[in-house]
């Protein structure tokens, strides 16, 4: 799917579906917060949430005391929703409206977090470009947290095909650039009650 088509798709999603109804909704992103906690990052650490949209991860990280947060999303509507929800605290966050494949990092991030953006990249050239961008943005002592549908997960998400990964497959794809520190599988229960099987990896 071309970049402009991807943008139109996600703008429609965020303009028509309330946060609490989308399949990826989490009132508290427990897995991401647990993985971040084990890193013992400084509160001044630069963290970027790729494809973060209006996820509540940013709210929780702000509440924990993190001061250098960036949220990147292809959808301006998603970012506006997040800003509205955060109110005055939205000024504490760097908001980046961009397709991840068009993103040109101008700084480095000690943590790159991505829950369910990477798995929408289904062509080798897209995956290669994503990893090149991430490698440019993450210093050698930095970390990457990646969540994607597992090999037991559904073949589509929000009406789009996804690339599913076991822990070993995710490790293999990222191996040229990153080393796996910890991997896990888990089930996410959507607001409608369906189960989505995820693979998460913590890399450096």
Could you tell me what each predicted segment is?
Residues 1-107, 121-137, 142-204:
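Class I (Rossmann-like) S-adenosyl-L-methionine-dependent methyltransferase catalytic domain
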Residues 110:
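Conserved acidic residues
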Residues 113:
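A conserved beta-strand element that flanks and buttresses the S-adenosyl-L-methionine
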Residues 116-120:
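Short catalytic micro-motifs in class I SAM-dependent methyltransferases
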